[in-house]
Amino acid sequence: YQRESLIRSFDNAHRLLNSPAAKAFDLSLEPVENVKRYLPAGVDPARTFQAAQSRDGAYERETLGRFGLGCLLARRLCEVGPRYIVVTTEYIPFLNWDTHENGHTRAADMKRQIDAPIAQLVLDLEERGLLNRTLIVVASEFSRDMITEGKPEKTVKDQVEVPEKIEDLKHYGMHRHFTDAGSVLLFGGGVKKGFLYGRTAEERPVKTIENPVHIEDLHATMYSALGISPKLSYEIERRPFYVTRDGLGKPIRDVMA
């Protein structure tokens, strides 16, 4: 039995290595001009590939090109059939989206990292006729407030001291988690193009003031676009587990094409 199991494992590994999905992971097969379109302006594809192939941690330090290569890989995988793909900018303490100082400058840099790759992914999938059956969701787990952390006259560890007159970008912290509003982008998958749903206040605290969306409704909208009932549940130990919270999610029909 153990020998048969081992042989089956080798057979499965051989099939996987020779499958279209395995070839999709080989980004060296992609024309250089295509790779460039997925990278921020000025980022050298050769340098990014060299970092990816190194063993000295260079790729872990490479930030500008990683998300772009992830989007390129996502497009290649969409062409061969995987049903669920995740691309992330990754969590690195006090870096990237963890904006504990220079928040507005950091946000501008992060937008530079994700802007071209996301746009090119959408364009490529549309050109290949894959966008109408692919739902692209760009989201984060929470928003940030636009002021520095802490309360007046209360000390916060390693807090940037903010003068009465702000003259330096580092004083814009964008520290605090903010749950009263946020933004999610949806592309393809049966959703409208160029459509804006909801509105936030013009002044702080910039809460949602029109068409608020609860997380279970966002999930229901995504499932509905994919042809899955938001009330679908699976029974585990005689208890129903719903794909949306308690099966209460309702699709936002206004965003559907």
List the predicted regions and their residue ranges.
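Ligand-binding pockets and gating/stacking loops
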Residues: Y1-A257
